[in-house]
């Protein structure tokens, strides 16, 4: 019995460290991009997946000690997909005492009616879902819409656009919505997916499957995700370095004439960003930028679904 108690204490200690890391990552992202301000009413989009559960949990945690006052309202869109467990989210949110709204819209039926059998439904479904969430944000008086995309999602989007779209475009931590009426934020922008997965496992969130509509995962995105996971295993620090690169863009050393006035360079122009090194090679640090050793990776791997008692 004593040994079991010691194991539980160790698991709880490791979970606390993991939660502190996620809390620090979210706090830094909020500060860097001014995501949340005094008096904000944040609409937290809750899908029932590990990412949105984690986002809600960390935001609730930060809310208790933040130097500013802000409120949260969780919103789930019930799209009437077959097999969707309607009771799961209301029961979970009522247990937490979190304000919430379940929006019921049969977008599944609309998509099935409009899209021929065998064709991808994701594009239309996404547009319908986005419009409903924007409308709901207005109805609730929300000042910000929080989405659960994390660092890996942002990098995947960058490489998708580079490999298939021919542009360097990622997923913004904060930006105006496409209808120009709402501010969309991604508080998990600095969080690693593997940390979120461990946290979700340890907290035993009631996960709802994401493919109830029967759609297939985006093959191109899956290829990119597999590539990044392989790099993360084989080249420690590469993922951190790539994300750091997204925060240190040097337009003068790229080729976009909209971002830098190359035509305006004449004799007598100032040296910009170190100038052109011509035949000299740029010095590259031995340790990848932004990378820190995983000091407690083995300990964190011990977190499993059986740590239900940790709150």
From Swiss-Prot:
* Cofactor(s), names only, from the UniProt record: Mg(2+); [4Fe-4S] cluster
**Keywords assigned by UniProt, alphabetized:** 4Fe-4S, ATP-binding, Cytoplasm, Iron, Iron-sulfur, Magnesium, Metal-binding, Nucleotide-binding, RNA-binding, Transferase, tRNA processing, tRNA-binding
Main location as per UniProt: cytoplasm
GO annotations of cellular component type: cytoplasm
Localisation per UniProt entry: Cytoplasm
Its UniProt pathway annotation is:
tRNA modification
Which residue ranges does the UniProt annotation give for the motif PP-loop motif?
A: 47-52
Question: Which residues participate in [4Fe-4S] cluster binding?
Answer: 122, 125, 213
Q: How is the cofactor bound?
A: Binds 1 [4Fe-4S] cluster per subunit. The cluster is chelated by three Cys residues, the fourth Fe has a free coordination site that may bind a sulfur atom transferred from the persulfide of IscS.
User: What reaction does this enzyme carry out catalytically?
Assistant: cytidine(32) in tRNA + S-sulfanyl-L-cysteinyl-[cysteine desulfurase] + AH2 + ATP = 2-thiocytidine(32) in tRNA + L-cysteinyl-[cysteine desulfurase] + A + AMP + diphosphate + H(+)
Q: What is its EC number?
A: 2.8.1.-
GO annotation terms (biological process): tRNA thio-modification
Q: What class of enzyme is it?
A: transferase
Protein name (record) = tRNA-cytidine(32) 2-sulfurtransferase
Species per Swiss-Prot/TrEMBL record: Escherichia coli O6:H1 (strain CFT073 / ATCC 700928 / UPEC)
Which gene produces this protein? ttcA
